[in-house]
Design a protein with these regions (language model features):
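Short, conserved beta-strand/beta-arch hydrophobic-aromatic motifs that form part
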Residues: 43-103
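Short, Lys/Arg-enriched charge-dense amphipathic segments
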Residues: 1-2, 58-73, 112-115, 127-129
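Short, solvent-exposed coil/turn linker segments
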Residues: 7-10, 77, 104, 114
Length: 129
């Protein structure tokens, strides 16, 4: 857990103004849609910082702040994979490729999406449903 959570200014500087807008859009969507606990930590290999959204010990998703972009990580268990497959055609080809290329572990399919702009925001909202 981070002792000092990065400020909006620090995130804006790290991500860049355009990418920071996307970050804020996704964070605001999650906060408006779900009641979640937010946990900050160092991002290790995935980014400088990680912002994890959790409820009752279960993680909804994690954002990894990086220089000029960020990663959006979601882990799909069996039921979430079935939901994705049932509405697969609603997702862009790029998101389908991220899904297909993601590794499946004992606890689910770990999908990491690199975010540089608003291109995947609607897909991400659909992935969170």
């Amino acid at each position: 857990m981070l002792e000092n959570i990065p400020t909006q200014e620090e995130l804006n500087e790290l991500l860049g103004a355009k990418v920071f807008e996307v970050w804020e859009c996704i964070v605001n969507y999650i906060n408006e849609t779900y009641v979640m606990e937010t946990l900050w930590d160092i991002g290790r290999k995935a980014g400088k910082y990680e912002m994890k959204f959790r409820k009752g010990g279960k993680t909804l998703c994690t954002l990894y702040a990086r220089e000029g972009n960020f990663g959006f990580m979601i882990i799909y268990g069996k039921s979430e994979r079935e939901k994705f497959e049932n509405k697969r055609s609603l997702f862009s080809e790029k998101i389908q490729a991220y899904y297909d290329d993601a590794k499946t572990y004992h606890d689910g399919k770990w999908i990491m999406i690199d975010i540089f702009d608003f291109a995947h925001v609607e897909d991400i909202k659909n992935m969170l449903e």
